[in-house]
């Protein structure tokens, strides 16, 4: 029996005239794509033949190109078949949504552009390094560009890659371990472009970084596609003030919420970490070892230390129903509500079987989620209230087709990517709970 619920309508945000001829996507979820007043949205589009960053004024219906890329896609994490040292680093683009400045890598240059398209070169990427998703501090003063020894992606995508994205056949993190490859947290002054410091993280492949929202001396970073111990190695903190780095998630059976009896284990899969606005908590999700998917919260108290001299941490995790096994991402609004592009299953609905050539990473879940949902957590009770808002119907084929939903700053809308046919486009849906339509 189909017991489908009412849904809201999705609205096309990207250019409707060219929706079938070019791709348009949000910036990566570790930063917002929206101005503080939610009037302008910053997008990556290849409408002129090459990926560039565009500002779309949603109230006036105008567009402005902010970058000047004419060399395709730079090779980096998730864009494995890009060109070495040439092109736009699609993974590098991040927005200072308060001052409306974008930061990005063009060829080997670290650049900044304002909303009027005034471009300034801040610095350069050192030779022999590979870059990934960058991040700007909330106060707008610092830019962190994660880099790794170039050997990490030293391969020919055409002969040594596989899948739609041509990722290498070798285990990337294992190469970092075996060959002693390092990552570097490179932090720059956003005005002068000066390198403020560079922290070496040994035997590590960093692809995601996020400044603490209230303390730019603290950076959260990841170990991407961990070859071992993903349950504890994935999420990490570097405290520049104390010059220490450490894993955030620990093993243990003291988890609050509702883990359905699963203890935290190094053999779990953990992913997509993000700060809450106050910097007191880190949200993440993943799956228990031979168990269900889960979403978690780590409260981290930087004012008190444990027996190891590290900040006191407490964990809440909520195990999902067994049938909620569709890969997705959890993002948060400014009020603590989550949104998700996967996991949820509409009761009674037949699951669409998808042939996902990118479904070959370390995660244990299927890439066949079809809904944008609003998820209201009660961490202490260990419950999640799922509200399906609309279908995104993306095919999940490649990073750019991952919906990666984000809230408007006002919390009233959710924006997401979707490829329903041949191209990726950006849509929005109301975050209000859908209402039944009653006949009178």
Task: Give the positions of each predicted feature.
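A short helix->beta-strand "capping" segment at the edge of beta-propeller domains
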Residues: 2-27, 386-390
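Beta-strand-rich domains and repeat architectures in extracellular enzymes and scaffolds
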Residues: 15-53, 91, 209
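Residue position within the beta-strands of beta-propeller blades
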Residues: 40-44, 103-105, 142-146, 218-224, ...
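Short, conserved, GDST-rich strand-edge loop motifs in beta-rich repeat architectures
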Residues: 46, 87-89, 145-180, 221-233, ...
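Asp-box/WD-like beta-propeller blade repeats and closely related beta-sheet repeat scaffolds
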Residues: 70-184, 195-201
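Conserved blade-ending motifs and adjacent loop-strand segments that build the rim/top face
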Residues: 250-257, 313-331, 381-407
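Loop/turn-rich, solvent-exposed surfaces of beta-rich toroidal or solenoidal domains
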Residues: 276-295, 318-385
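Blade-level signature of beta-propeller repeat domains, shared across WD40, Kelch, NHL, RCC1
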Residues: 401-440
